[in-house]
């Protein structure tokens, strides 16, 4: 992509309404535009990152055996009355009526709808286990939307729902999602810690929030710092095997949100030098809620003996759009964003330091064509901005690699390769720059 033809509305000044780093940088980098309180238009740069994150979430859900579908944003109020949650949910749920006076709601979550879909088609235990997920926009009418995508009213979520014949099978499904979440966040360059948490309006008696430690987080958390050193399962993890050892390894180390924190146990089990009491950002939460919805909504299957029983369920959410904010909070410096390569909008930026000069134009065009041909996402800054402005833009938007092409280096047959993560620079031949970025 040539920057001269791209839509990248960089802001020179920090908007006054932006309170935290991620919100400030997303606005300054031209990733978002606020259209109403807590509601944003996703501009091209932000949309590219959003799609990268969404794809990682999708790949890890598929790897764990979940099956993708897509449910509508609008739901019938009667479904929620059937489960008993319509009146219990509160003012965060946007309730509307169509021209025929039918009561609808803009879904904040999908337990009722997925249960209705399940009960319409699945009648036997032989169709289990089953895990269905979708990635869809949600709306919750937050009283005080703030912090950009961290606490917006409209947001993109991945929601998965598991269906099993009994509690033992349902807990195995829970474990699969637990491991899938560890892998998902690690692939994005995040250390997300699973912490015991309240189940809230979803219900049930087992839940973990996945928390990224950050001083700007909305949650107070307590944990043993040893949890930061635990290994994340690799691609070869067997989701059909026994995942209990992995779960025990992660849950035996103390980690809890404020709602379920046990002060005496924390003091007793965690050495003073490993105690962490800080804040964190919730990027995902998983629940086992047993037969709460299946009993209320008559989602029954015939067991091996032919007797109908309510299925045991779980739900598993990832805040896809919120993850952008969490990643920026964890990966930035005074100059801008430092995207992990897996989610960066572009892998590399070519900076023509003397636009219009025949030798630099030719070298940049050669690099651009070769990288595009090899499938590298590359942004070519072919604008007539001065070099300092190009450096500032590339640092602000956080592209992992910058290729600096100037007359002085070309005279020696080299370009400068800069790594955004640590600021390191190296002079390399053009062919070597291409080779590095296509490894």
Swiss-Prot record:
InterPro entries: aa-tRNA-synt_IIb, aa-tRNA-synth_II, aa-tRNA-synth_II/BPL/LPL, Anticodon-bd, Anticodon-bd_dom_sf, Pro-tRNA-ligase_IIa, Pro-tRNA-synth_IIa_bac-type, Pro-tRNA_synthetase. It comes from Rhodopseudomonas palustris (strain BisA53). PANTHER family: MITOCHONDRIAL RIBOSOME PROTEIN L39/PROLYL-TRNA LIGASE FAMILY MEMBER, PROLINE--TRNA LIGASE. The gene is proS. GO terms for molecular function: ATP binding; proline-tRNA ligase activity. Homodimer. It catalyses: tRNA(Pro) + L-proline + ATP = L-prolyl-tRNA(Pro) + AMP + diphosphate. This is Proline--tRNA ligase. Catalyzes the attachment of proline to tRNA(Pro) in a two-step reaction: proline is first activated by ATP to form Pro-AMP and then transferred to the acceptor end of tRNA(Pro). SUPFAM superfamilies: Class II aaRS ABD-related, Class II aaRS and biotin synthetases. The keyword Aminoacyl-tRNA synthetase applies. One of its GO terms (biological process) is prolyl-tRNA aminoacylation. Belongs to the class-II aminoacyl-tRNA synthetase family. ProS type 2 subfamily. The keyword tRNA-binding does not apply. Its main location: cytoplasm. GO terms for cellular component: cytosol. PROSITE patterns: AA_TRNA_LIGASE_II. Its EC number is 6.1.1.15. Disulfide bonds: none annotated. It is found in: Cytoplasm. Keywords: Aminoacyl-tRNA synthetase, ATP-binding, Cytoplasm, Ligase, Nucleotide-binding, Protein biosynthesis.
């Amino acid at each position: 992509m040539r920057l001269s033809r791209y839509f990248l509305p960089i802001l020179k000044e920090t908007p006054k309404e932006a309170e935290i780093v991620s919100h400030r940088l997303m606005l300054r980098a031209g990733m978002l535009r606020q259209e109403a309180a807590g509601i944003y238009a996703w501009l091209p740069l932000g949309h590219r990152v959003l799609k990268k994150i969404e794809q990682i979430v999708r790949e890890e859900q598929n790897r764990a055996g979940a099956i993708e579908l897509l449910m509508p944003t609008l739901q019938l109020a009667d479904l929620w009355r059937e489960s008993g949650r319509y009146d219990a949910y509160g003012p965060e749920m946007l309730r509307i009526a169509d021209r025929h006076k039918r009561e609808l709601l803009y879904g904040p979550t999908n337990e009722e709808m997925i249960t209705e879909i399940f009960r319409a088609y699945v009648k036997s235990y032989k169709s289990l286990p089953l895990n269905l997920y979708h990635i869809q926009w949600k709306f919750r009418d937050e009283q005080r939307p703030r912090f950009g995508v961290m606490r917006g009213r409209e947001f993109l979520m991945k929601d998965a729902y598991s269906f099993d014949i009994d509690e033992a099978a349902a807990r195995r499904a829970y474990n699969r999602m637990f491991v899938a979440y560890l892998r998902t966040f690690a692939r994005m360059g995040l250390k997300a810690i699973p912490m015991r948490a309240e189940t809230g309006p979803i219900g049930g008696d087992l839940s973990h929030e996945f928390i990224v430690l950050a001083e700007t987080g909305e949650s107070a958390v307590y944990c043993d710092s040893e949890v930061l050193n635990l290994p994340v399962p690799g691609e070869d993890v067997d989701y059909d095997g026994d995942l209990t050892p992995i779960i025990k390894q992660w849950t035996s180390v103390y980690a809890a949100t404020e709602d379920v924190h046990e002060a005496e146990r924390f003091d007793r089990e965690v050495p003073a030098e490993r105690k962490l009491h800080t804040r964190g950002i919730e990027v995902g939460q998983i629940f086992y809620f047993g037969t709460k919805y299946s009993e209320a909504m008559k989602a029954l299957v015939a067991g091996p003996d032919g007797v109908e029983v309510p299925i045991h369920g779980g739900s598993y959410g990832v805040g896809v759009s919120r993850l952008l904010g969490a990643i920026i909070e964890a990966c930035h410096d005074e100059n801008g964003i430092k995207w992990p390569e897996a989610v960066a909008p572009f892998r590399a930026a070519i900076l023509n330091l003397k636009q219009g000069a025949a030798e630099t134009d030719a070298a940049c065009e050669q690099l651009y064509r070769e990288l595009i041909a090899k499938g590298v996402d590359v942004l070519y800054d072919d604008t007539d901005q001065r070099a300092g402005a190009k450096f500032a833009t590339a640092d602000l938007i956080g592209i992992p690699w910058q290729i600096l092409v100037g007359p002085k280096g070309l005279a020696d047959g080299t370009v400068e390769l800069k790594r955004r993560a640590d600021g390191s620079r190296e002079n390399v031949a053009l062919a070597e720059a291409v080779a590095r970025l296509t490894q």
